[in-house]
Structures are given as C-alpha cells and as structure tokens.
Design a protein with these regions (language model features):
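Phosphate-binding site recognition
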Residues: 1-153
Length: 153
C-alpha cells in the first residue's frame, strides 16, 4: 500500500486529454539527489496537482514498476539522467486522506501510517534483521545501513 507503488495512477493521468507535461520537475529532482538540497516539499494550493505530481514521481523512481516506455514521450526522456534514476529507488507514497478512513479517525493516522510502513519494510527486507527498532525512522535507518538503499518518501 505504501512501499514501491506501481505506475497505474500516472498512466491514467497521461491518458487524459488534458495532461500537460510536468516531467521537468523530475529533471530538477534528479539534479539535487545526493546534495544538501535533496529535501523537497510538494506544496501547492488545493486542487493544483499535488497528487498528480506525487504519482509522477512515484512512477519514475519506484522499484515497483517499469516506467521507461511510459515516460518516453515526455521531456524527461531527453535528459542525460533519465535512465540513471528511473525505477531505482524504494519509494514510500503516503496519501493521508486515504489513511484517515483506514485508521478509523484522524487521531490514529500517524500511528497507522508508521505501523503499516514498518510492516511493509520488514516484509520487503525480511532477509535482514530489522527487529532492533520499532520506529519508522529507526527501520528506515536500518534498511539504509544494511543495504545502502536510499528511500524516497
């Protein structure tokens, strides 16, 4: 649900007659990976494309899919970094609105997200001992230390 989403949401978006190519954002994001500017906040007013942007970034970075053909018609495919980062990362996508109902209320959302993410990470990395910690930050740190993998949230 959270870890390594597929590209179906973005595929649906680009199939729309009104899609406007925003993949230049991926080129920018690629340029700040492994720099001190790597922390990016996708903040926009309501109904201005936050979910579409998140879907695009997930489709591009997630190991949970193969998105090369999906991105070929768009600006990012001409970037020198296009294939370097394409589908190379574990990605955690969090849709807070969807989690409110699943968590049975707004007051349980943070605990719900943390517990579900921890469970998915422990299942995905079951061949590593990730039992030393029960916090999401701790598990993310352990995954990185034991595998070298970077995780996009």
């Amino acid at each position: 649900m959270f870890l390594n989403p597929n590209n179906m949401n973005f595929k649906e978006t680009v199939s729309s007659n009104v899609y406007v190519d925003k993949t230049g954002l991926i080129e920018y994001t690629n340029s700040v990976i492994s720099t001190t500017s790597k922390f990016i906040c996708n903040s926009r007013p309501r109904r201005f494309g936050k979910s579409m942007t998140a879907d695009m970034l997930c489709a591009y970075y997630s190991k949970g899919c193969d998105s090369k053909e999906l991105f070929m018609p768009y600006h990012i495919s001409s970037s020198p970094t296009f294939e370097k980062y394409l589908n190379q990362y574990d990605v955690i996508r969090i849709d807070v609105q969807a989690c409110i109902a699943l968590a049975k209320g707004v007051f349980n959302v943070v605990d719900y997200i943390e517990n579900e993410c921890i469970q998915e990470l422990k299942e995905t990395y079951s061949n590593y001992d990730l039992l030393r910690t029960d916090t999401l930050l701790g598990v993310l740190h352990e995954v990185h230390m034991k595998t070298g993998n970077q995780i996009v949230v």
